[in-house]
């Protein structure tokens, strides 16, 4: 009898429960982002404060997410973080897409940067190391991939940079870890990334002068898309608080919104009387090889004109630290063809540069960009005034692939 009554009660509870479930809407599960983002910040230089601020901006961006998402940040800077006061470590932030980060309600606008750093989960610490060493970068990236396994990965690199060059003032191409000579070439950087044996959805270069065809060529087989600036990037860098949700959602249209957010941010600063300038591009890596074929065709066809070419007729992107570092690619091709862009070249540029934007008015005014002659991609044109650059230029794979090796200059090259 007791068993029977228990059975009746259990059936009653089950029926009541079923009826309740039918009437009460259940909360929808929060979707998970398919992309995990890895940020590699080399800040043992005068960008320490700015790159720390970027971590805070990334946190703010995560707080606005409506997806579950993971962010890992490798930090190498002057500022020491955590209870062990580490200078080389990996921070982890995970949002549930419902306003919580690392299991706690996201910090509000009154929180300090130290509060944000305290909220991080420190998942790895390192002894003192040079983060711009190829093997060190590869090891750290492999650690990050292991710590946050994902089928899709995105990369952010933040530091100083100088496009393909091995020298502007120092040996910098990317990064500056302490002394000026503690830097790395982009070929080594590309190899360090490639050796993780992962294909990345995107690389966002929060660093100067990385929006050149030489850089795009170097990273073409490593990631699907490249987001970069052909000019210097202001010290604040990219406004991560405005676009993390787009980076995590992926696809071309969202990456375009990332680029637009960058220019909108600096346009707002300019409109309010602040120092501001910006160039940004979205590059389709799989189309870079086809673009290089078109470039080579044009360089070889016009090699006599290029033998003693006057670069002063072109829009230059090295406004202060890097005179001669990059000129507008499409404007060069147009000038070589009497002011007309060949149809095949123009068509390929549209396939390769999926988005471009800039500030036509800037502060200082010398950083303003002529939109009519801005194609979203720069190119180095050998000039007599840069003999050391030229010597190094001839060692690059790009030198042959682009057709520059077939130009006989009217000066010692």
Regions found by a protein language model. Name each.
Residues 1, 7-34, 383:
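Bacterial Sec-dependent N-terminal signal peptides
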Residues 19-149:
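N-terminal extension/subdomain marker
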Residues 36-41, 70-75, 154-157, 201-205, ...:
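Structural recognition of the beta-strand scaffold that forms the well-ordered cores
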Residues 47-49, 81-83, 165, 215, ...:
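Short acidic, gly/pro-rich beta-turn/loop elements at beta-sheet edges
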Residues 49-59, 84-96, 168-183, 391-399:
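Surface-exposed flexible segments
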Residues 142, 146, 161-163, 169-413:
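Terminal, contiguous helix-loop blocks that mediate binding/assembly
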């Amino acid at each position: 009898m007791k068993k029977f009554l228990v059975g009746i009660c259990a059936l009653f509870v089950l029926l009541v429960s079923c009826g309740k479930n039918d009437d009460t809407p259940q909360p929808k599960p929060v979707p998970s982002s398919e992309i995990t983002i890895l940020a590699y910040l080399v800040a043992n230089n005068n960008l320490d404060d700015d790159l720390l601020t970027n971590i805070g901006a990334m946190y703010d961006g995560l707080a606005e997410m409506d997806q579950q998402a993971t962010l890992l940040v490798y930090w190498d800077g002057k500022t020491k973080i955590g209870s062990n006061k580490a200078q080389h470590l990996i921070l982890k932030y995970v949002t549930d897409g419902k306003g919580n980060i690392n299991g706690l309600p996201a910090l509000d606008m009154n929180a300090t940067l130290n509060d944000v750093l305290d909220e991080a989960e420190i998942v790895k610490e390192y002894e003192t190391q040079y983060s711009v060493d190829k093997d060190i970068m590869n090891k750290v990236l492999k650690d990050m991939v292991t710590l946050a396994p994902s089928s899709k990965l995105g990369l952010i690199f933040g530091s100083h940079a100088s496009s393909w060059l091995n020298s502007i003032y120092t040996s910098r191409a990317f990064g500056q870890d302490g002394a000026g000579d503690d830097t790395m070439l982009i070929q080594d950087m590309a190899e360090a990334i490639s050796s993780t044996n992962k294909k990345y959805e995107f690389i966002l270069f929060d660093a100067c002068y990385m929006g050149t065809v030489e850089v795009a060529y170097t990273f073409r087989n490593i990631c699907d898309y490249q987001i970069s600036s052909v000019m210097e990037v202001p010290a604040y860098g990219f406004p991560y608080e405005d676009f993390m949700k787009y980076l995590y959602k992926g696809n071309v249209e969202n990456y375009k919104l990332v680029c637009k957010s960058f220019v909108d941010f600096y346009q707002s600063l300019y409109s309010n009387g602040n120092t501001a300038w910006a160039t940004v591009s979205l590059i389709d890596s799989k189309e870079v090889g086809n673009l290089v074929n078109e470039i080579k065709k044009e360089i070889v066809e016009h090699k006599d004109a290029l033998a003693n070419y006057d670069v002063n007729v072109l829009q230059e992107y090295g406004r202060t630290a890097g005179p001669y570092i990059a000129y507008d690619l499409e404007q060069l091709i147009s000038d070589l063809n009497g002011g007309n862009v060949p149809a095949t070249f123009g068509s390929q540029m549209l396939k390769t540069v999926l988005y471009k934007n800039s500030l036509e008015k800037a502060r200082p005014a010398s950083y303003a960009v002529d939109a009519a002659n801005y194609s979203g991609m720069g190119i180095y044109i050998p000039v007599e005034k840069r003999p050391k650059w030229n010597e190094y230029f001839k060692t690059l794979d790009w030198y042959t692939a682009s057709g520059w090796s077939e130009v006989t200059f009217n000066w010692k090259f």
